[in-house]
Amino acid sequence: MELWDKAERLWTRVKNWKTVRGWHIWKLKLVDARLYFVSMFVGLLTGLVAVPYHYLLYYLFHLRSGFFASHPAWYWHIPLFLFSWGILVFVMWLVGKMPLIGGGGIPQTRGVINGRITYRHPFIEMVSKFVGGILSFSAGLSLGREGPSVQIGSYVGSLVSRWTHILKGEQKQLLAAGAGAGLAAAFAAPLASSLIVIESIERFDAPKTAITTLLAGVVAGAVASMVFPVNPYHLIEVTEPVFAFFVQMKYFLILAVIVSVCGKFYSSTMNAFRHVYAKVNSPAYVKNVLSVLVAYIISLMQVKSDWR
């Protein structure tokens, strides 16, 4: 009888252990499902912010190009030059107040995801990055859309992680999801953006990170497709290769070497100019005149070459 009671108590413990273990597994699944749902929300918000950023860049580019293509009288260039200079002074003031909004955006995002730096005021910095990027582009400076879009997405991920009180270990995944959503909003390519984020920004192939980044990218890409039904990258003609694959390999290798050398030369030249620019002993608003002047001259030369 005692043996039977011991066996019954042991069986009760086993059932309780299975129940607790099963509940623990379901709890983990619910936490993962919540993370995936929140990542989709991050993608939606990122699309609603990054897509207007892309649209305004597109609109201001054509507006500026139309102005120079119309060949206005010389006196119209004076107020535009002064306006561009004032914009650059204001943007430099913003960067002085919030240094993280300066630069391309991808190195800053990588630093935040890796825990080296933090966003203290993500909403204010996101608005400043948005406004500063639009104004700088309208002033004629050469700015890409992928880097700022990535950083804007990481700002959204940081904000949502604070609003939803997400677990500390999952904040990094929301930052990566926001970065991927920003890239997907810029190019309407969710799968490519997820791979780029995992490879060059997050650099960690956790399944959760891949899933959250892909979900956020799909939602942001859907928002971008609604605003821009015709993706300009889809208009690129694809031609069938003439040579065999093994014959093409040597050309691919040669192209890789040429692109690597040119890219390294461009990067080294940019860094050299940065050091020279930093050594100029003049106030920032005076040095900005040189930047605006160079951008203005390039715009004039480009219009004249197109007109010819």
Kindly give the residue locations of the regions a language model identified.
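Alpha-helical transmembrane segments and immediately membrane-proximal extracytoplasmic
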Residues: M1-R308
